[in-house]
């Protein structure tokens, strides 16, 4: 399973700002969108193109457009919403397929409680977005759901990933490609990524934050 850690200078700079313990909700939210957009650039670099002719100012001109499968963006609720606008800024025509996954804080197991998928998801490339890939439970549950719905080409974009989460996805779904801004050190005893970002959902929505 390919894992792409995107070490672009802009991503490294923005991710460094996001790691600050005293970052404001506004700044964290804006940076999540910006890094999400930059990851989208990488995750769509291999989209197929086809040529066609248009009337140009000096006569007919041959240009290119994206061909083949279209895209559906799949935010894992709730934190994935924080990356959605950044992704849609590059692929504004994409459909949004929302998946709600809750994690049991004691067992760390994931439970799916919502699915609103594009009706033609089998004909689209699915881009899952979630700020954190920690234990991998939420990601694996989401991929399970998408494949059951007929999705055949699935990619995941996360801001930070733990090795444990990457391995969980690799074991369950070796065909899924992961794009991340950083592969961090490890998980702590509570299942939080170290050094991580803290609780990304709380920081995006301005609710109570937890230490990570």
From Swiss-Prot:
The known regulators of its activity are described as: Allosterically activated by GTP.
Q: Which UniProt keywords apply?
A: Allosteric enzyme, Glycosyltransferase, GTP-binding, Magnesium, Nucleotide-binding, Transferase
InterPro entries cross-referenced by the UniProt entry: PRibTrfase_dom, PRTase-like, Upp_B, UPRTase/APRTase, Ura_phspho_trans
| Molecular function (Gene Ontology), one example | uracil phosphoribosyltransferase activity
Kindly list the biological process annotations in GO that this record carries. Answer: UMP salvage; uracil salvage
Q: What does the cofactor section's free text say about binding?
A: Binds 1 Mg(2+) ion per subunit. The magnesium is bound as Mg-PRPP.
Q: What is its EC number?
A: 2.4.2.9
Q: In which pathway does it act?
A: Pyrimidine metabolism; UMP biosynthesis via salvage pathway; UMP from uracil: step 1/1
Q: Where does 5-phospho-alpha-D-ribose 1-diphosphate bind?
A: 78, 103, 130-138, 199
Task: Tell me if Repeat is a UniProt keyword of this record.
Answer: no
By sequence similarity, the record places it as follows:
Belongs to the UPRTase family.
Summary of the function given for this chain in its UniProt record = Catalyzes the conversion of uracil and 5-phospho-alpha-D-ribose 1-diphosphate (PRPP) to UMP and diphosphate.
Instruction: Please give the name of this protein.
Output: Uracil phosphoribosyltransferase
Organism in which the protein naturally occurs = Pseudomonas paraeruginosa (strain DSM 24068 / PA7)
